[in-house]
Amino acid sequence: MPFVFRTARALSGLGSLACATVLAAAFVALSIASQTAAAAEATPSETSIEQRIQALVPSLEEYISANMKNVDVPGLAIGIVAGDKLVYAKGFGVRTKGGAAAVNTQTLFQIGSATKAFLSTTMAIAVDRGKLHWDDRIVDLDPDFQMRDPWVTREFRVFDLMAQRSGLPPYANDILGFLGLDRSARIRSWRYVDPVSSFRTTFAYTNITHILAGRIVARAEGAADWNAVLQSEILDPLGMTDTTYSAAAMTASANHAVGHRYTIDGSVEVPFDQLFPYDFDAAGDINSNIEDMAKWVSLQLAGGTTPGGQRIVSAENLAYTHTPKVALSDKAFYALGWVVQPTPNGDIVWHDGGTFGFAAMVALQLDRKLGVIVLSNQSTVGMPIGLGLWTLDRLLGNPMVDYESITLAKAKATYTDDVKRVARPADPQPSPPLAPLAGNFANPSFGKAALRMDGDTAALEIAASGAKLRLDPWNGAVYTATLVPEGKFAAVASNLGPLPIAFAQFQNDKDGKPTTLRLTLLDGGQAYDFRRE
């Protein structure tokens, strides 16, 4: 069976694997290496950074080539920035597996959740202008905003939108987007989600708050949408002329990469999805290349000014976006659109992104004004994050960690666990017929749905989007729910691979009648009750 990853992990910014446990393993490994190494290499002087970059190039290129071959990455581009200079930039491989067109430093890739740092910077710009304040209450800016807990609703502030500590489950209600519900429905759905931890205490990666954050920034700036703010406040001043944020712009480019996903048998091309990640807006909709992203990195390294001296954002509010808000582990923290990872020779501030077929990583060492960008046309195995951290560790003189092996091993283990969970028992209990249970249902987050029969096959159809989840017998009254690859969902289903999205089970009321269909997501375990109408 092909090696794939689950729905919610697709847009997480934490590893191309989009799995925080993978990163935790890497952080633990770095901690152990730091503690057991006799001593770190001498910290490089600022005047030697460019020389160190050039000296690293042969081993860097050897490392890239070996790892691309190891996990069958079709194409990749990397850039290393020192101050306002792109010191090293190169493309490797091809834009499409089996094709002849080579990747270069102008090839467009989706950057996924590396977009989130652009969002936090536009927030900082609005704060500079007094149009927003970091501690503004969200209900004062959007009276329709509501969480399950009334106290959390009142206390939720602007900085909370990006701090990944909402108290809700990881990737809360992201599944609504993959199943075609619009952004407003997703934002509204958070009022129905039960918290799993106390507000502001525990890291849990989410995307929907970033969609709302983009709307709030746009409203504060008087813009049509967040992308308009991105264009006028960051892309235009920096001259990022190749950077876009739509499916049409991506496919219109004569030099764009094609997405692939890893399988045990090698990478396979994935269908281009017109909606994802673009329908996730400020959470992950940017397309860019190495040359443009180098300009973005230079802005961060310069504390908010362009090479020409134009101030885009104040150093104070930009630094606030790099300030930790919640612990990821005992060795890493989440800020606003950035992860902050202490190392023996300085903090690395980074974020990555993963979409259907693409992975990206941006990493900064602010004290040394050093940055790395990695863009790839293969998702799910974590090469950009591993390569980015490996490169900075080498340049900073940190103890070495084999991130690529760690992330790949964890990825395979995660997949194996998923396969075991959904494998049908050898001697399953007979499943009751679903035809008598067909009818209309509703869920607060999804809205109306209908369980319909097509011959002997049952499918739950979401009225708001037309998405269909096929129910297949698993064990007794438990079924698996798999997205039917029809219409606009064909690309989504293909990208998700063969594993089901959820388990489905009918639950009886006090009179013993099956009145509720519960869907429990395979990834993360979030449950949705569809009640018979």
Q: Model features per residue range: what roles?
A:
Residues 13-33:
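Bacterial N-terminal signal peptides
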Residues 91-97, 150-356, 360-364, 379:
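Short, surface-exposed loop or secondary-structure junction motifs
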Residues 49-111, 131-133, 140-141, 146-148, ...:
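Short, conserved catalytic-motif segment at the N-terminal edge
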Residues 361-364, 368-377, 517-519:
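Short, well-ordered beta-strand elements
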Residues 72-75, 356-359, 445:
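Short, small/polar residue-rich loop motifs at catalytic or cofactor-binding pockets
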Residues 39-41, 389-533:
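Peripheral terminal and inter-domain segments
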Residues 1-15:
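N-terminal secretory signal peptides that target proteins for export/translocation
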